[in-house]
């Protein structure tokens, strides 16, 4: 619930509160309600009190039990049972509804006016009958004594359809080209229609003759109002036997007594938007007038503002619940508005508990956020290395990105850059220190960025202040003190690159302009001194001197630009020669590709194992690699990541090495020493 106060009148917004994501399970919703106070305190007065896209009109039945609303897309009508606080039924329609009327006390008889000239009748069971009118309709009213429906629209005629006979009657011919709105007085049955020319025509249904004509367009123009176009009638409402309120497309509301052709009061919304609806509140003598931006409540006797209501979204229709302080709005948003104003009256019988709740659940307005989820785009996922999670339960697709659990996001963010929080903390501390320094007594010094430009501006400002002709010239704002250019002297991205080709070519012109400016200042000062001494001498200098001076400046500037261009061409030539020399000294070497560390290539035997490993989450893979000792993560000085993988031996290699080791030990153990054997010379005959 959101509470606002204007002129000490409290307005409770019952449809404002934290919205829960639709894809959350019931268990998570219950857990969120236990944990979050804002979610637990929100009030859902009527269940599913919304439209798929936009709500266009909203009305309450005469018995007060049913609330009917039309909207789009697809075009539909929804009926809500207030006694059950839920949706009773929903019916889809063939086209959008312009307006509708409830003919019975409940929802059993409804008439819809569509934007394709169709008139559709619905009974309690559903669709009953459909017919068409000759022109596009904009509004209609029901005359109970004669059972006639009066339709006005893009025609000068007012079409009459008798529901008792089931046929069209002779239309009423008005003097207007088109008619926008109409209404019937419930006391004496006077029929009034608002025209596109800004007039109101009143007709007697018994004689089918016009009995009055009001020129509201002329009366709506006051001394304070600014009118850019012809005001046309956009809203019309009777109250009692003698009072009528008229709303115009230029944002004025005129209050008339039927016995006079002059308005009793003219109220301007000051927005210049068409008045959409007008309602009377008899208990406090108030009038509720609404345009697409605001609902104003003002006294019909004095015109003094009582209070106003300004929703977040544009308004399409406003309905005041009978004999209560509840206000229903149809907005340019799926959710329909429910507002409770205790000063206007008590809460309706079906929600009498609001009187106690409004005293306990007052809270400040807060924006709707998803506290437990982080919204990330596809580019963010690529930077975090989480693109393989797309399609998994860890990511929920929403608009142009995904929702992910905030705990998982912080965990991955910490693994990608473990020192991000420390850097963020240091930046915040540095900003706080700079803010405290800025509050102290500041000395006149140059900014950190673009010092030369700032010095030039300061010198020019000082020269202007020293000169005596500054009084004749309109003072211009200084760039150094202008907030629009403040970033240019604080952000290093705006530093002027004096080594660039554009600056070097433009620099002679800038320097010559500054020299010319100084010379002109000196000449003007000398000229003013001469004028004081000799008043008869004419102002200025001879034209030939000016032309010679300008020609000399132009020649010097052209020579300087040519010189800078020659220097740039020489530098470019030297750079090309250096690049050519480097290319000649470069020796092409073969490029080798190695397998990832921690893996070995054994044909395609382990493809199933690798596939199973790749299907695991990033957290599980990191745990496995850290456990095996094949992965080590470290940070470099420039803020990037360095990953080191250790090649591990396979099980077959380990077994082979163990077998060789055992074989060597066994050979060593079974080996017999032959050190005791010595060679002896055999005796025999010597050869001669």
Swiss-Prot record:
Bias (Basic and acidic residues) ranges: 648-663
GO annotation (BP), single: maturation of SSU-rRNA from tricistronic rRNA transcript (SSU-rRNA, 5.8S rRNA, LSU-rRNA)
GO MF annotations, alphabetized: RNA binding
Sites of N-acetylmethionine modification: 1
Modification sites for Phosphoserine: 25, 475, 514
Pfam families with a match to the protein in the record: Beta-prop_NOL10_N, NOL10_2nd, NUC153
Subcellular location: Nucleus, Nucleolus
Alphabetized UniProt keyword annotations: Acetylation, Coiled coil, Nucleus, Phosphoprotein, Repeat, WD repeat
Top-level taxon of origin: Eukaryota
SUPFAM superfamilies xrefs: WD40 repeat-like (SSF50978)
Residue(s) carrying Phosphothreonine: 481
Region listing for Disordered, in residue ranges: 529-557, 645-688
Coiled-coil residue spans: 423-446, 514-589, 640-673
Gene Ontology CC: one annotated term: nucleolus
Family: Belongs to the WD repeat NOL10/ENP2 family.
Protein name stated in the entry: Nucleolar protein 10
Source organism phylogeny: Eukaryota, Metazoa, Chordata, Craniata, Vertebrata
Gene: NOL10
């Amino acid at each position: 619930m959101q509470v606002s106060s204007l002129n000490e009148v409290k307005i409770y917004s019952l449809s404002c509160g934290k919205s829960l994501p639709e894809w959350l399970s019931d268990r998570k919703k219950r857990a969120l309600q236990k944990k979050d106070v804002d979610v637990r305190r929100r009030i859902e007065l009527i269940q599913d009190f919304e439209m798929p896209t936009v709500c266009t009109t909203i009305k309450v039945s005469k018995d007060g039990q049913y609330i009917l609303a039309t909207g789009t897309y697809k075009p539909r009508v929804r009926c809500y049972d207030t006694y059950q606080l839920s949706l009773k039924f929903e019916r889809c329609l063939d086209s959008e509804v312009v307006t509708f009327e409830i003919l019975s006390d409940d929802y059993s008889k409804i008439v819809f006016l569509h934007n394709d000239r169709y008139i559709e009748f619905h009974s309690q069971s559903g669709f009953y009958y459909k017919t068409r009118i000759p022109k596009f309709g904009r509004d209609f009213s029901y005359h109970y004594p004669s059972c006639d429906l009066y339709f006005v629209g893009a025609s000068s005629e007012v079409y009459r359809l008798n529901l008792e006979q089931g046929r069209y009657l002779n239309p009423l011919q008005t003097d207007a080209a088109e008619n926008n709105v109409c209404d019937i007085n419930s006391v004496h049955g006077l029929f009034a229609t608002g025209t596109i020319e800004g007039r109101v025509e009143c007709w007697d249904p018994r004689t089918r003759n016009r009995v009055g004509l009001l020129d509201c367009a002329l009366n709506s123009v006051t001394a304070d109002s600014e009118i850019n176009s012809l005001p046309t009638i956009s809203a019309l409402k009777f109250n009692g036997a003698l009072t009528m309120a008229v709303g115009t497309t230029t944002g004025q509301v005129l209050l008339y007594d039927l016995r006079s052709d002059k308005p009793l009061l003219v109220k301007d919304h000051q927005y210049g938007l068409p008045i959409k609806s007008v309602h009377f509140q008899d208990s406090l003598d108030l009038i509720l007038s609404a345009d697409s931006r605001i609902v104003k409540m003002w006294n019909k006797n004095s015109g003094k503002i009582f209070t106003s209501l300004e929703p977040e979204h544009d308004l399409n229709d406003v309905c005041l619940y009978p004999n209560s302080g509840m206000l229903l709005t149809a907005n340019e948003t799926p959710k329909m508005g429910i507002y409770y104003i205790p000063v206007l009256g008590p809460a309706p019988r079906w929600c009498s508990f609001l009187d106690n709740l409004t005293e306990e659940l007052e809270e400040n307005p807060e924006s709707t956020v998803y506290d437990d989820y982080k919204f990330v785009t596809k580019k963010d996922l690529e930077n975090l290395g989480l693109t393989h999670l797309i399609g998994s339960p860890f990511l929920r697709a929403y608009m142009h990105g995904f929702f992910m659990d905030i705990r998982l996001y912080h965990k991955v963010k910490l693994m990608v850059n473990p020192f991000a929080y420390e850097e963020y903390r240091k930046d915040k501390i540095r900003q706080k220190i700079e803010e405290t320094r800025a509050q102290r007594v500041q000395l006149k010094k140059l900014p950190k960025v673009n010092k030369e430009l700032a010095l030039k501006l300061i010198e020019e400002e000082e020269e202007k202040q020293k000169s005596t002709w500054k009084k004749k010239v309109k003072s211009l704002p200084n760039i150094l003190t202008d907030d629009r250019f403040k970033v240019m002297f604080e952000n290093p991205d705006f530093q002027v690159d004096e080594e660039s080709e554009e600056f070097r070519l433009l620099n002679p012109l800038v320097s010559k302009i500054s020299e010319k400016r100084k010379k002109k200042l000196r000449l003007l000062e000398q000229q003013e001194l001469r004028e004081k001494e000799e008043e008869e001498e004419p102002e200025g200098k001879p034209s030939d001197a000016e032309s010679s001076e300008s020609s000399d400046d132009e020649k010097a500037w052209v020579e300087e630009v040519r010189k800078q261009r020659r220097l740039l061409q020489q530098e470019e030539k030297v750079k090309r020669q250096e690049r050519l020399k480097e290319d000649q000294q470069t020796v092409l070497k073969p490029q080798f590709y190695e397998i990832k560390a921690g893996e070995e290539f054994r044909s395609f035997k382990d493809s199933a194992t690798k596939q199973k490993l790749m299907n695991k989450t990033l957290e599980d893979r990191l745990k496995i690699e850290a456990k095996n000792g094949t992965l080590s993560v470290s940070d470099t000085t420039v803020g990037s990541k360095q990953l080191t993988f250790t090649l591990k031996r396979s099980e077959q290699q380990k077994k082979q090495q163990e077998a060789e080791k055992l074989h060597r030990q066994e050979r060593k153990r079974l080996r017999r020493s032959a050190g005791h054997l010595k060679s002896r010379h055999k005796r025999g005959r010597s050869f001669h």
